[in-house]
Amino acid sequence: MFSWGLSCLSMLGAAATTLLCAGLLLGLAQQLWTLRWTLSRDRASALPLPKGSMGWPFLGETLHWLVQGSRFHSSRRERYGTVFKTHLLGRPVIRVSGAESVRTILLGEHRLVRSQWPQSMHILLGSHTLLGAVGEPHRQKRKVLARVFSRPALEHFVPRLQGALRREVRSWCAARGPVAVYQAAKALTFRMAVHILLGLQLDEARCAQLAQTFEQLVENLFSLPLDVPFSGLRKGIRARDLLYQHLDEAIAQKLHEEQAAEPGDALHLIISSAREQGQEVSVQELKVQNLPAVLQESAVELLFAAFFTTASASTSLILLLLQHPAAIAKIQQELSAQGLGRACDCPPRAPGSAPDCSCEPDLSLAALGRLRYVDCVVKEVLRLLPPVSGGYRTALRTFELDGYQIPKGWSVMYSIRDTHETAAVYRSPPEGFDPERFGVESEDARSPCGRFHYIPFGGGARSCLGQELAQAVLQLLAVELVRAARWELATPAFPAMQTLPIVHPVDGLLLFFHPRGTAGAGDGPHL
């Protein structure tokens, strides 16, 4: 018995020694990791590095970021300030928020910083995208794509978008059970992007399959840049290659068309631009120029820009309107004042039947421009729940920001969400839902930094080209919802919001929809 006790004590002592040594080694490794980045500061500058933590060797604070979501950034902002350092996705990062600092970053494109996204995102989206282009190639690509979002193009899109949104709202009202709004919004925005923006002719089954593959790609965009079995990057690469296979046939058909089925769509403009530069080259010559690969990557980039972000904002719009019935009443008043308060005359469809409606669209860009309160609601949704949390840049040279040095070569991430949350230029607290805050402009909002308090679409040379189209989609959705439907929670409480990779409700937002004027079947909050 005595020898057994000594044996146990010996084993416990050995285990304790092992744990102590492991702890000391981990602590030493962390200190050496921190020292490695401290020594990487630009010694030509007397300014210190921003405060912050570089986390654990190689992993940095990536795991904390993935687990904590938006709380990761807010907790460090409270501890270190609006400019702090961290280490995410394999790179040292300076996190920036606040209008003045964000203005420096966004207006410093090509001078202080250049666009940079996580390596995994660059690998998955490709090298021919607007997102990854720098300098003159970026300006040329932006010039081509700007034609897609010109006012004549938007005038062409609006009636088709309204028709698609009207049919979707009617289908939600005809559903026999609860609708998972986020999933439905993703399917809807993907169909609109494929058929209206890209002009591709795909049937519903193929479009749904394409959407599922694309979603898997986007879910792995922000992953560690390690191409090993079962890694997020490997899953994303498989999804991307499968997506290219699906797109190849549709793009090949597009290349053989003399004129687009829907003039003005994005792929038609890219093809036309290549032909103009090549003086009407043939399809075979376009293929030699690697145009199919360019079109594949451009199509995926446009889908990424239109798909998840618009679906996220659409879901947030529906959620916030449900939480704030007073906004619904004001939208109804504005629609009535503009003679737009009446929904289509088609009778409500029986549950399970086709949601088709033969009514002509009655909205245009000019009509949307007169709906001032609807515009304020959309802006407030994008301010309170911006779909994308921020943007990435790389420092081209060491420069000063808020009393700190930003070393050359380090990544800079400007925060949209944190900037919105801390802006003090509005007449009401920034954490509340108040569309009318956009009805009155304060003196601070007119300052040089004023427009950088509200940046859901970024700013500067990299501002979102499709922002007017996105806002039009949200305005159309608000109008069609308010005048045609009522909706209520299908769950006991409102869901929490997840912020990575795109803002969305954790349960997809389960709601019951009813045609306006009919009795609801639920007991939860409803409109």
Which residues fall in each region the model found?
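Cytochrome P450 catalytic-domain helical core, especially the substrate-recognition surface
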Residues: 2, 52-71, 92, 118-201, ...
